[in-house]
Amino acid sequence: MPLKAELHCHIEGAAAPELVIRQAQKYGKDTAPYIQNGSFVWHDFTSFLAAYDFSAELFRTEEDYARLADHYLTSLARDGAIYSEVFTSPDHATKAGLSPKAYTDALGEGMLRAKAKTGIEGRMIVTGVRHVGVESIERAARFAARCGNPLVTGFGVAGDERVGEMEDYVRAFEIAREAGLGITIHAGELTGWETVQAALDHIRPSRIGHGVRAIENPDLVRRIADEGIVLECCPGSNIALKVFDSFADHPLPALQAAGCKVTLNSDDPPYFWTSLKREYDIAAEHFAMNEKALAAVTRTAIEAAFVDRKTKAALLARLNGAAR
């Protein structure tokens, strides 16, 4: 089993159905409309968001969030992952009645619990949400810059790509960049190549969340390759959300063949009936990646990770040791 690393997963979207059911029992909520036969059920983007929001609202206390992070990273480690970055949302903290700091520190505590048991390293990317608004995104950036938690190492923007313009988020990313945080932004998923180009022009990230619609513009693909931008690809998510009709249509192999740096990620794994392990299995089955190619994908992820040099070197040493 190849060692794995993940750069793109939303922590609220990583809550496994069995954990959500336990949380629902704790708070007296009925999961029947959203979980059936041990799986999340939804039929379009609106119903997906409804299921997601229902589950997210079941995490309300610091211990709830610590349990969530511990549960997810421990499950990743069981599947061979040695590194995990998760997107966190101060907006979810506010909805839960927690301060962003209490929420973040609780998630960090869960990560440390998982590390103590399994050795997995975890980091957080504080994330603003497009459809919540520019002011909220800038608040998230200011929080990320000053929160003081050593596991917060990145800043990003997610949410509905159809809302807002990249120019709107320049100040937020300036705040994050000045604080030394790694920069990533969702683009080129539900919208076309234009959002990827706008992100490169205005935000100047080192990584793009998804970015797969760049395949629609050969000049943009060349630019991504030339600039060494790392794509956080999520094939299982893309098929579940009908960004592409099938894995045979997915552009990851073409992007890689064009010289783009690609990684494998699960996005919101239980909602898309996937996992990081399954993403690696998909790459093996549908993209003809052998063990060496999969190890190279993991290496790309670790090299692009928002983590200090010492930890990165240790992760690469683990990967090199496993490859011998």
UniProtKB/Swiss-Prot annotation:
Catalytic activity, as annotated:
adenine + H2O + H(+) = hypoxanthine + NH4(+)
Biological processes annotated in GO:
adenine catabolic process; hypoxanthine salvage; nucleotide metabolic process
Which positions are catalytic residues?
E189 (proton donor)
Q: What is this protein called?
A: Adenine deaminase
Classification lineage: Bacteria, Pseudomonadati, Pseudomonadota, Alphaproteobacteria, Hyphomicrobiales
What is the protein's species of origin?
Mesorhizobium japonicum (strain LMG 29417 / CECT 9101 / MAFF 303099) (Mesorhizobium loti (strain MAFF 303099))
Outline what the protein does: Catalyzes the hydrolytic deamination of adenine to hypoxanthine. Plays an important role in the purine salvage pathway and in nitrogen catabolism.
Q: Name one Pfam family in it.
A: A_deaminase
Supply the SUPFAM superfamilies for this chain.
Metallo-dependent hydrolases
Instruction: Give the similarity note.
Output: Belongs to the metallo-dependent hydrolases superfamily. Adenosine and AMP deaminases family. Adenine deaminase type 2 subfamily.
Where along this sequence does the record place binding of substrate? D268
**Keyword field:** Hydrolase, Metal-binding, Nucleotide metabolism, Zinc
The UniProt record lists the keyword Metal-binding: yes
Q: How is the cofactor bound?
A: Binds 1 zinc ion per subunit.
* Source domain of life: Bacteria
Query: What are the EC numbers?
Result: 3.5.4.2
Q: Which cofactor does it need?
A: Zn(2+)
Q: Name one GO molecular function term.
A: zinc ion binding
